[in-house]
Amino acid sequence: MSPSLQEGAQLGENKPSTCSFSIERILGLDQKKDCVPLMKPHRPWADTCSSSGKDGNLCLHVPNPPSGISFPSVVDHPMPEERASKYENYFSASERLSLKRELSWYRGRRPRTAFTQNQIEVLENVFRVNCYPGIDIREDLAQKLNLEEDRIQIWFQNRRAKLKRSHRESQFLMAKKNFNTNLLE
């Protein structure tokens, strides 16, 4: 082996190799911090925690797992039982639930909006008149109904999809009825 290759081999043995593009490095899991300050995302449905209660900085408390245990994936993939038991031993059930809640906004999920009967009646009345309301109408509705405008926009999208689905089903039933009567004649 040439001397330069021997030096390279010795350097590799003495120094642990770390890639700047490794998953641990990108996610910041290689840092020895108990608390990683985060910028506040616009997620009004997300639970927030403040680090001191006074400054209002968001803080995600993620305990560092002991060496040899990899950090659990945020994506819900089935894990082999032996790996799952390692996590169960390290994190308590309440810690796992808390961590899942804190990271849930990464998956893009939000709690389902529960509309009151009054809100549904008002939205249905507007839908009967105009199933494609403009931004000005949606903003007025949002203010009157104490909802966010984007929730109202989604409600109208879902309502139009429901109307289209029911129209398609009624067309199918009429065609089926006509087909059956033609067969009997």
Curated annotation (Swiss-Prot):
CDD domains found in the cross-reference section: homeodomain (cd00086)
**Keywords, A to Z?**
Developmental protein, Disease variant, DNA-binding, Dwarfism, Homeobox, Nucleus, Transcription, Transcription regulation
Query: Molecular function terms in GO for this entry?
Result: chromatin binding; DNA binding; DNA-binding transcription factor activity, RNA polymerase II-specific; DNA-binding transcription repressor activity, RNA polymerase II-specific; protein homodimerization activity; RNA polymerase II cis-regulatory region sequence-specific DNA binding; RNA polymerase II transcription regulatory region sequence-specific DNA binding; sequence-specific double-stranded DNA binding
| Name of the protein | Homeobox expressed in ES cells 1
Q: What does this protein do?
A: Required for the normal development of the forebrain, eyes and other anterior structures such as the olfactory placodes and pituitary gland. Possible transcriptional repressor. Binds to the palindromic PIII sequence, 5'-AGCTTGAGTCTAATTGAATTAACTGTAC-3'. HESX1 and PROP1 bind as heterodimers on this palindromic site, and, in vitro, HESX1 can antagonize PROP1 activation.
Pfam families noted in UniProt: Homeodomain
- What compartments host this protein? Nucleus
Q: Which Gene3D superfamilies match?
A: Homeodomain-like (1.10.10.60)
Q: How does this chain assemble? A: Can form heterodimers with PROP1 in binding to DNA. Interacts with TLE1.
Q: Which GO annotations describe the biological process of this protein? A: brain development; camera-type eye development; canonical Wnt signaling pathway; cellular response to cadmium ion; ERK1 and ERK2 cascade; forebrain morphogenesis; gene expression; gonad development
Would you identify the family this protein belongs to, as annotated? Belongs to the ANF homeobox family.
Q: Which PROSITE patterns match?
A: HOMEOBOX_1 (PS00027), HOMEOBOX_2 (PS50071)
Disease annotation reads: Septooptic dysplasia: A clinically heterogeneous disorder defined by any combination of optic nerve hypoplasia, pituitary gland hypoplasia with panhypopopituitarism, and midline abnormalities of the brain, including absence of the corpus callosum and septum pellucidum. Growth hormone deficiency with pituitary anomalies: A disease characterized by low or absent growth hormone levels, in the presence of a hypoplastic anterior pituitary lobe and ectopic or absent posterior pituitary lobe.
Q: What is its main location?
A: nucleus
Spell out the coiled coil positions from the record.
none
Q: Does the keyword Transcription apply?
A: yes
* Binding region for DNA: 108-167
| GO CC term (a single one) | chromatin
- Annotated InterPro entries: HD, Hesx1, Homeobox_CS, Homeodomain-like_sf
